[in-house]
Every structure is written in structure tokens, then in C-alpha cells.
């Protein structure tokens, strides 16, 4: 049974993804945040949800080598990026090595994780989205599969990155410690709830404006 208290839950959804009996569903609160709901009749107490939960099990990330301040040299590309274009620059290098990128795309009233394997697809992932993006079970599966095949860059909030690293650790143990995962992660500043993002276009319409896009640079 999941032991994470509601006040400590980040809504990453990794417990629902990892549950072998599909006993956990992510349910949205009135504030717009996602929380796990456990079906006790399906739960077999395998404890896997507690092992992957980033609030209960913080993954070891080793020592920090150093800290850098970076900015893209290409000024044209920089204008379409945030945070100095650090994510874009790292992503370019990963693509040059035939890797895959996972980031968030803004679809107006919904944010979704999307995979990019080309510069054209990467362009859709640029720019900050100052709202929480719920990562789907499908996206978790695609990310883990990608790390097993080749170099993979994931941009996500610290809780989601921790969840992915916990999944890697569990899978590595299942495979006798021989599994090799090629993962690079990028952690932006945490976001507000997605409910505001969904309702904000309606608020703009009331002011006589229509929301077409939101960029944070």
C-alpha cells in the first residue's frame, strides 16, 4: 500500500505507472493537482509504489562536479529559448549522437510530454512553461525504453527526474544489475498547478483578448 502522505506527494504519477495490478489512478483535486487513489481490492502489497516514489525514496545522484553559467552563441536561436538556451544546446549535442529528447509541449490548454529526434521536433520543446505538466504512464514507458536503446535527454521537474531515476534503479535490479541506461536530465524550476493554465485562456477572453500562445523568456 502506498505510504506517501498527500502533503508530501508531488503528483509525478510514477506509482500509478509502476503498479503491476493497475491499482493506482491519478485523480485531480479541486485545485488542479494530481494525487494517487489506491483501489485496495486490487492492491497486493508488492511495495513497488513505495520503492519508486521520489518523496519516499530519493535517488542517489552522486557529487556535483561543478556549476556553470551558459548561454547559446547563436543569437537567433537564443531568442526562442529560455534560461540562456542551455536545454537547447545540450539537446543539440544529444541529437548529433542519434539520441532522443523528451520535453514539454504547450497545446494551448494542455501540457504534454513529447519525444523529439530532430531539430524541427526540438523547436516545439523550447521555452519555459511555468505550469506543472502531468507525465502520462505512456510517456514514462517511452522514456525508460529510450534510455535502454541510446542516449536520452529528459527535461522535467526534480520530482519527475527523481521518479525516472528510481524506475531505472528498479529495472536494473530486475535485470541482475547488468542493464545500462544512458540518461541525461535537466531540472527547471518547479511549476504552479495546471488548472490555472487550462482556465487562463477563458480569463483572457473575458478581458476581450484571445490567448494564442504563452512564452516565458
Feature map (PLM): residue ranges:
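Iron-sulfur-associated redox domains of electron-transfer enzymes in respiratory
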Residues: 54, 60-217
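Short, charged amphipathic alpha-helical surface segments
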Residues: 41-42
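Iron-sulfur cluster-binding cysteine motifs and their immediate structural context
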Residues: 2-8, 14-31, 35-37, 47-64
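Conserved SAM-binding loop
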Residues: 11, 45, 153-154
